[in-house]
Regions:
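Carbohydrate-recognition beta-sandwich/jelly-roll modules
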Residues: 1-68, 72-75, 92-94, 106, ...
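Aromatic- and carboxylate-enriched substrate-binding clefts and catalytic-loop regions
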Residues: 67-280
């Protein structure tokens, strides 16, 4: 059956129960040391969207903000249809590839770095690559849904696709890095495939598989990701954006999810924006 084995350790000493996780080196720590992250939360389905974003960024440049890493959301690839997986074409309503490439070139002229979103968790039925055979399964054999008309991609399939897709994004658009969504954001068991002969049907299988997928994205440039379960992948990417969960994040005690003796080389925690935008 589908089972997990858990071991619980209790102690009055924090350092005795802190999990020991490997900390690989991505080799990009110095590259990002001086850069502030600018996270674009949403891009409207309009041909003026990139112009508006650029004007905002140019205003920041005039104010003296010279080192900025601009992280782009999944709307770069779609116009509200959620087809953001394995895509190599800019969203049509925003001007397609021409508008996206011109905008990214303009960011370089400002001296800013950019990252484009990638996601290997699910695939939409509207995606040209959609095939029921590449979808993970539930225990009853049906494709595992992750949202409206979207299904969990077999993570063995994702693992084989991710390296080339990530490299293709950087080669085509000349961006500085990749912004990986979901893989360090949701728990690794959410990627479990219950189909016959599945390569990741348990936490013990899913965790190293997700670590491999994340690691493949840092081979050709900067790689950052959305967090939430990022403590399981310390050092695999160059950094994680992870807001504290809950209705009132500023009133929730921060979760200590890092080794206090190795805070600096693993991650930097920061709070910016409104009081409810503290990062975990």
């Amino acid at each position: 059956g589908f089972q997990e084995r858990w071991m619980l350790t209790a102690s009055t000493q924090f350092d005795e129960v802190l999990p020991t996780l490997s900390i690989p080196g991505t080799g990009q720590t110095d590259t990002l040391a001086e850069y502030t992250w600018y996270n674009i939360p949403h891009i409207k389905a309009s041909e003026e969207s990139y112009v508006e974003i650029y004007e905002n960024l140019r205003s920041l440049k005039r104010l003296g903000l010279d080192y900025l890493l601009v992280n782009h959301p999944d709307e770069t690839w779609h116009d509200e249809d959620g087809n953001d997986t394995l895509t190599l074409t800019g969203a049509e309503a925003k001007g397609g590839d021409d508008a996206l490439s011109e905008y990214l070139d303009a960011l370089k002229d400002l001296g800013y770095k950019s990252s484009l979103q990638v996601n290997y968790r699910h695939i939409a039925t509207s995606n040209p690559l959609w095939n029921p055979e590449i979808a993970a399964q539930l225990s009853d054999g049906s494709p595992a849904p992750t949202g409206p008309d979207r299904y969990l991609l077999k993570q063995s399939e994702a693992q084989s696709i991710a390296p080339d897709h990530g490299r293709s994004i950087i080669d085509k658009y000349k961006c500085d890095g990749l912004y990986v969504s979901e893989h360090a954001e949701v728990p690794p068991w959410e990627f479990n495939d219950l189909g016959p002969n599945a390569s990741a049907s348990s936490l013990a299988d899913s965790h190293p598989l997700q670590q491999s997928i994340l690691s493949s994205q840092s081979k050709h440039g900067i790689a950052i990701g959305k967090g939430g379960n990022h403590w399981l992948y310390g050092g695999v990417l160059n950094g994680y954006l992870a807001r504290i969960v809950g209705a009132e994040p500023s009133r929730i005690p921060p979760l200590v999810d890092f080794d206090l003796n190795n805070l600096h080389p693993i991650e930097t925690d920061a709070g910016v924006g409104t009081i409810e935008q503290y990062f975990a």
